[in-house]
Every structure is written in C-alpha cells, then in structure tokens.
Amino acid sequence: MALLFLLPLVMQGVSRAEMGTADLGPSSVPTPTNVTIESYNMNPIVYWEYQIMPQVPVFTVEVKNYGVKNSEWIDACINISHHYCNISDHVGDPSNSLWVRVKARVGQKESAYAKSEEFAVCRDGKIGPPKLDIRKEEKQIMIDIFHPSVFVNGDEQEVDYDPETTCYIRVYNVYVRMNGSEIQYKILTQKEDDCDEIQCQLAIPVSSLNSQYCVSAEGVLHVWGVTTEKSKEVCITIFNSSIKGSLWIPVVAALLLFLVLSLVFICFYIKKINPLKEKSIILPKSLISVVRSATLETKPESKYVSLITSYQPFSLEKEVVCEEPLSPATVPGMHTEDNPGKVEHTEELSSITEVVTTEENIPDVVPGSHLTPIERESSSPLSSNQSEPGSIALNSYHSRNCSESDHSRNGFDTDSSCLESHSSLSDSEFPPNNKGEIKTEGQELITVIKAPTSFGYDKPHVLVDLLVDDSGKESLIGYRPTEDSKEFS
C-alpha cells in the first residue's frame, strides 16, 4: 500500500523535471547571428548581431586555434553586454586559422552557440599603409619607408619581417611619379643593407633638375601575396641651385621698383592733396606798426648819375679844408699862408669826386654846425639846378677841418690840426654871405654812369666825397656802386 502511495509522487517529480528541462532548451533563447571576424593591423575583433529583448542579454565568446595540440575552446569574453570582442590576446600564429563561437544568456536561460567561419589574420586581415619620408641629399632623393604598426598579443609593434615566420612583409613596392610618368621600385626587406626592424631606405638618382617627384609605397606579405594599403603620395620639388639663385634677381628688382613707384606716387598724392603752405610769422607787438608803415609807404624810383671831376689843392686864410680822396693818393705835405716854408709841397693833391644826383628831397641841415662846406662848379647841366630831376641831396657828409697848430701827420710837420666829423646839414646852417666859394680848375666831364635803381645789403657800395651845386647850399656825401655791382644793374 505504501508503494502505491509513493509511485504517483515520484511520477509528478519526474514530469516537473522534464518540464524545467524543456524550458531551458536551446529553443527558449534566440541565438546570435552574423558572427564575423575583422582584423586591421593584425588586431582581430569578433562582431555579431542580436535581436531586441525585454531583458538585457549577456554574451560569451570562445576561440579555438588551429594547429595547437589539444586544441580546445578558450573563453575570450564572458558575460559582456556589447556586441563585439577583441580576441588579439588569444591568437597564436597570425598565419594559422581560428574559429570563434558566441552564445547569449537571458536571465537563467542560455541560447545555443553561433559559430564563425575559418579566419586567418595574415590572409583575411588588413594592414595599414607604411609611413614615408622624402628628402634630397646631393644628387639623390632618399626615401625612408617605416613599417606599419601592428598588434601582436595586444602589444603595438612593427610588422614582423622575420623570414622564419610565415606572416611578414616580404617586399615594398615604391611608386615614383616624375612629371606625369610613374616608375616602380621594389625593396626587399630581407636585405640588411636596405632594411632594419624599423624602416627601409631607398635612394633614387635625380635624373632632371627643376622637376617634382611624388612617392608612394605599399607592402606585400609573404603569405598568400596579401598587400597592405597604399600610402599617400609625398612630393618634393628639385631646383637647380644656380637657376634658383638667378630667379631671385628679377623678383627682387621688380619688388624694389614697385616700392620706389609706390613711394613716388604717395609723395605726389600727398603734395597734391595737401600742398605746402607758407607758415605765418608771428611778429612781436612792438614791430607790427613798423612793418605796417613800411609796407604802406610808397617811394619814388630814384635815378643816380655819377660825374667824375678833378680839382687842384686850394687854401684859405688860416684854415684848410681837406677832402677825403676816393682813390688812393699820396699827400706828402700841405702848407698854409702863415707858414709857407715849414713844409715843402712835393706833390699836388688830387682826388676824384663824384656828383650823385637823385630826385629825392633835401633834408634840412642841423643848425649850429661849424663845419665849412666846400663848393664846386660843375660844367654838367645835371648839377646846375637843385630843383631839376637830376639833383640829389644826401644827409651826411665827410669833411676834415684843419687849423693852425703844431701837429705831425704821415711823417711831416704841419701847423694845422684836422678835425674829422660826420653830421647832418641844412640850408639854414650856412648863410650865403659867409660861404667861401672855391673854384676848381681843369674840370672835365669824364663819364656819366646810370646807377642801379635799387640798393641793398647784397649790393657793394663805395663812399664818395662831397658835392655842391651852383647855389652852394648843399654839402653832400654819397655812395656809388663798385664795378662788380654794375654788372647786376
């Protein structure tokens, strides 16, 4: 009876166990799809796809290498939520084949494994382009080719070119393009003279100057003839040094010419827009009235005529009036009527005086002067009348008044003393009855000179002796221009 009672309980437990096993079967959780392996620079990565689930699924990736003893599935990634796995750490020989399988787990349920196809890193993977450097040395172009960087067991390193392995770059194809034409060169990595663990080097002779060289390269693997990606072109232009130097000459000349023309144009433009203006001179207040009176005053144009005459020495009672000669003359001695024997008269006193006439008015002579004027008659009609346009009066005269005294001059004893004075004279100073008239002998008109109409500090002048007209009222001192100033008149 007890056995009959226990039998139904055992049957119920077995049925429940079978039902639980059916729930955990492969058909209960979807399997991953499109499991693929991609490798770039020997860095293999597994990718897969999975449908959207209410719960977030997790994945497990296993790798199996071909040719390994006791080859088994090795866990590469466990319980990851993303849809890729890097298996570079679990790859032995890059040239050998490998397989990958992936399963999903949702909650407590797992899916079946999804397997990939056979994959070899060296055969099916991609390798990036090598790096290039180009330079010119003397008459050659040096090309440096650096091995592409790869990942081996998770470490970045250059591609193995050891011939003992089956996955290495055996040769580099170098493409040189010059002036549109392309030439291909090959570099064997097994030659120690050309390559080392880091780079390979190629020397190309320069065939023509003033040309552009563009270089690109790609590597070829030893296994299955797989090629790397082709590098970008690196260009260099070769110039002839002599031609390059000569090209600077016209460039510099053109630049200098442009600068000069620019400066000239700028100066001309500034001068045209902003012409130079005379700066006004600010005078002090004390000079303003003087400048105004000088600019407003009008002066008539003067005319100057010079008359050259000669005369003989003369004497007065107890008084001798001497005139300053114009030209150098030797006066060894003079005597008066009182002392005729004291000094011997060795030479006749001679001088040349000039009559200077002008149209200006004659100023008055300061009264009170005791100087005796000297009068001369002139045969020229220019000096006959004071009111005519040919008459001139100067404001000063130069005379020497001599009186009897014991005085020696120029080495000769004489009883007369001379007083030299400069003063301004007027008509009222000399009464007509007190003036002594002195006649000149041998008056002769030599030349008539028209003096320049203007004098200034820039014109040379010479002081001349006194002149008197027929009336004997004026005693004048004048200036005449020298021979050099006549050229400017």
Curated annotation (Swiss-Prot):
Extracellular side: 18-245
Start-end of Low complexity biased regions: 379-391, 415-429
Reported effect, C77F: In IMD27A; interferon-gamma-mediated signaling pathway completely abrogated
Effect on the protein of changing Y66C: In IMD27A; could be detected on the cell surface; interferon-gamma-mediated signaling pathway completely abrogated
Biased composition (Polar residues): 349-360
Modification sites for Phosphotyrosine: Y457
Gene responsible for this protein: IFNGR1
Range of residues in the leader sequence: 1-17
SUPFAM superfamilies according to UniProt: Fibronectin type III
Compositionally biased intervals (Basic and acidic residues): 335-348, 401-412
The name this protein goes by in its record: Interferon gamma receptor 1
Keyword annotations from UniProtKB, A to Z: Cell membrane, Disease variant, Disulfide bond, Glycoprotein, Immunoglobulin domain, Membrane, Phosphoprotein, Receptor, Signal, Transmembrane, Transmembrane helix, Ubl conjugation
Mutation effect (V61I): May influence susceptibility to atopic dermatitis complicated by eczema herpeticum; could be detected on the cell surface; no significant effect on interferon-gamma-mediated signaling pathway
Residues the record lists as Phosphothreonine modifications: T372
Disease affiliated with this protein: Immunodeficiency 27A: A form of Mendelian susceptibility to mycobacterial disease, a rare condition caused by impairment of interferon-gamma mediated immunity. It is characterized by predisposition to illness caused by moderately virulent mycobacterial species, such as Bacillus Calmette-Guerin (BCG) vaccine, environmental non-tuberculous mycobacteria, and by the more virulent Mycobacterium tuberculosis.
Quaternary structure annotation from Swiss-Prot or TrEMBL: Monomer. Heterodimer with IFNGR2, to form the IFNG receptor complex. Interacts with JAK1. Interacts (when phosphorylated) with STAT1. Interacts with SOCS1.
Modification type Phosphoserine: residues: S369, S378, S403
UniProt-listed PANTHER family: INTERFERON GAMMA RECEPTOR 1, INTERFERON/INTERLEUKIN RECEPTOR
Topological type in the membrane: Single-pass type I membrane protein
Origin superkingdom: Eukaryota
Organism (species): Homo sapiens (Human)
Post-translational modification: Phosphorylated at Ser/Thr residues. Phosphorylation of Tyr-457 is required for IFNG receptor signal transduction. Influenza virus infection leads to phosphorylation in a CSNK1A1-dependent manner.
A GO term for molecular function: type II interferon receptor activity
Gene Ontology CC annotations of this record: membrane; plasma membrane
